[in-house]
């Protein structure tokens, strides 16, 4: 975020966006499964793995990527060990960025420099794609490469 605030209305959120980058939150589905069994929804955060990068692109650099539908249209692919397992687009995100910022700031102070994750781009989750269709869960030694059009490539090795 470029600026901070509380209870930011969706109509003014564009002034708060410093830029866009790729984020892999390395969801811990085992922890999430335990929470879902309690009917609480996935609420438990983790502080051991999130990857960002390789750089941040400012909003003016993406002006032509916005569609008439008000959504950002950027292709996203995911490869594991050079095998394509996912091909999606940011226009498949359920909530628009403006609503995400509005919700995140509801009764909460957001600060300049905070990062907000948009959630998974359609087809971007091994759980939803089914592990049997993606060569299984990621494991030690695997190389995961996320590429988002105009945002670059984020590649990480599982250690």
Regions found by a protein language model. Name each.
Residues 1-101, 107:
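Glycine-enriched loop-and-adjacent helix/strand subsegments that border the catalytic/binding cleft
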Residues 10-11, 67-68, 102-115, 130-147:
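Acidic/histidine-enriched ion/cofactor-binding microenvironments in catalytic or ligand-binding pockets
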Residues 35, 42-50, 54-57, 91, ...:
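Charged, cofactor-coupling segments
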Residues 87-88, 111, 118:
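Thr-Gly-centered strand-to-loop micro-motif
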